[in-house]
């Protein structure tokens, strides 16, 4: 039986199982699809998305993206269709802000991160696995204090789709 992967669109051979057909060509595609579907629609609807190489933002064609130039950003769906780079992220601004907690254990988060969940649009584990990003609506100025960074404009945040808390 030939199936088409829900994530990458490639066709793959699978053994027939009427109770549970395979939807993905690999575990990697299954995980990638799951992570893409963790991000809430309120973020997906913003035209502030870019691809990434490491923590550097790039456009869907692979050229550099700028956190201050909306002409270099794209829609979520355009970014997900692109194969440029090795990931994706969002540009902050226009009321979208992010608390960045570095060097923390997501299983034992700081109290401040837990308190922020009540106003969070979305929260996820950072790319290192040892940090948290908590996205909120705010136009307060950016700052850094006590090992916590708050960004509200002109900043790129690489996303993982690893929702926190699970």
Mark where each language-model region is.
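Conserved phosphate/metal-binding and DNA-contacting active-site motifs used
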Residues: 31-166
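BZIP DNA-binding basic region
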Residues: 1-36
């Amino acid at each position: 039986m030939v199936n088409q992967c829900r994530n990458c669109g490639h066709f793959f051979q699978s053994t027939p199982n009427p109770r549970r057909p395979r939807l993905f060509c690999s575990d990697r595609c299954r995980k990638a699809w799951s992570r893409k579907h963790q991000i809430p629609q309120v973020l997906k609807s913003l035209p502030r998305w870019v691809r990434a190489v490491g923590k550097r933002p790039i456009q869907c064609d692979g050229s550099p993206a700028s956190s201050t130039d909306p002409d270099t950003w794209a829609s979520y769906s355009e970014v997900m269709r692109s194969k440029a780079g090795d990931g994706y992220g969002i540009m902050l601004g226009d009321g979208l802000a992010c608390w960045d907690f570095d060097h923390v254990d997501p299983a034992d988060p700081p109290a401040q991160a837990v308190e922020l969940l009540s106003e969070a649009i979305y929260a996820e584990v950072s790319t290192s696995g040892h940090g948290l990003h908590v996205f909120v609506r705010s136009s307060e100025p950016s700052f850094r204090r006590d090992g916590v960074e708050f960004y509200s404009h002109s900043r790129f945040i690489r996303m993982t789709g690893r929702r926190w808390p699970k």
